[in-house]
A protein has these predicted regions:
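Short amphipathic alpha-helical surface patches that mediate protein-protein
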Residues: 41, 45, 83-84, 109, ...
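Active-site- or DNA-interface-adjacent structural scaffold in DNA-acting proteins
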Residues: 95-134
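Charged, often Cys/His-bearing segments associated with DNA-binding zinc-finger transcription factors
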Residues: 1-35
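Short, flexible active-site-proximal loops enriched in glycine and acidic residues
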Residues: 73-81, 88-101, 133
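Basic, short loop/linker segments at the boundary and entry of helix-turn-helix/winged-helix-like folds
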Residues: 24-66, 70
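Generic recognition of stable, solvent-exposed alpha-helical segments in well-folded globular domains
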Residues: 19-22, 31, 35, 73, ...
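Short, conserved catalytic/metal-binding motifs centered on acidic residues
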Residues: 22, 40, 64, 78, ...
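Non-catalytic DNA-binding core/recognition domains of DNA-processing enzymes
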Residues: 60, 81-84
Length: 134
């Protein structure tokens, strides 16, 4: 749930950062993130009647991996930087609780096990190439 502080910080970000150029926001607008949604059913099988904690959005998790690759961050450093940098939060599209580093690691491992990690990078790169970026 967004708070008044979230809106205030976002307003300041929009007024002071975006006019000077935010490469992550520009990158985010180039990608059709919905193209990644079909792999979700291959990764998660919510068959338990007991429920449990809901999965974090697959798009948010993929964006974590992209940030990690772009900035050369370890899993613990990624967690710290996402907590610290508002531009990362804007790129992720959330001010909600962020996954800890072990969740990012487990997500990447799950992608590897299902052969989806390569698909994600190919899709990401192909979309950027289609927009004229190499």
């Amino acid at each position: 749930m967004r708070t008044l502080i979230d809106f205030s910080v976002l307003q300041e970000y929009n007024e002071k950062v975006l006019p000077r150029g935010d490469k992550l926001s520009a990158l985010s607008s180039l990608v059709d993130w919905n193209a990644f949604l079909p792999i979700e059913h291959k990764l998660y099988k919510n068959k338990s009647e007991r429920g449990g904690r809901p999965n974090i959005s697959i798009i948010i998790m993929i964006k974590h991996l992209i940030l990690q690759q772009l900035y050369g961050l370890s899993d613990p450093q990624l967690e710290l930087q996402v907590a610290d940098r508002f531009s990362f939060r804007v790129f992720l599209g959330t001010t909600e609780v962020i996954p800890d580093y072990s969740t990012v690691w487990l997500f990447r491992e799950r992608l590897k096990e299902n052969g989806m990690l390569e698909f994600i990078w190919e899709e990401f790169v192909n979309q950027l190439k289609a927009k004229g970026y190499d």
